Amino acid sequence: MKKLIIPFIFISFIWPQDFEPTNMSPIVAYWKTLTPAQKETYLFSYMTQTYETYEELKNELGHTDLTKWYYDNRAELVFGIFDQFKDKDLDEFVGWIDEYYSHEEFVNQPFYEAMAFAFRFQQAAGETIWEK
């Protein structure tokens, strides 16, 4: 009996206990490899691209349902963040995005969701997530 239990215990330590793999978004994997300065550049580039896409939609299509959807679901948040730049630094937004992606349940969420999280917490009073 003892000979049967020892291999079983040994195998249970070798075999991984968590069979559910984490599906990390490629954007999150890329984000985690960047330095803080590179993250600021990436965030600003993402926001600039969103702004330019919205402007192109307005110029090419006018104020259609697609343009309205893009504004409501993507551009409005970016415009709100741009408005915050006169009071807040870009590195504060980067810090909140890092905080968002530090939680395992959010690593498969799109970058837009992390920006929304950063924007909400940036506006709240307090210095840490517990104070907010």
Regions found by a protein language model. Give the residues of each.
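Basic side chains
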Residues: 2-3, 39
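Residues in flexible loops and secondary-structure boundaries
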Residues: 9-12, 42, 50
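Charged, low-complexity, helix-prone segments enriched in Lys/Glu/Asp/Gln
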Residues: 38, 48-57
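Compact alpha-helical subdomains of small soluble proteins
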Residues: 19-26, 53-132
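Immediate post-signal-peptide N-terminus of mature secreted/exported proteins
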Residues: 17-44
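Sec-dependent N-terminal signal peptides
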Residues: 3-16
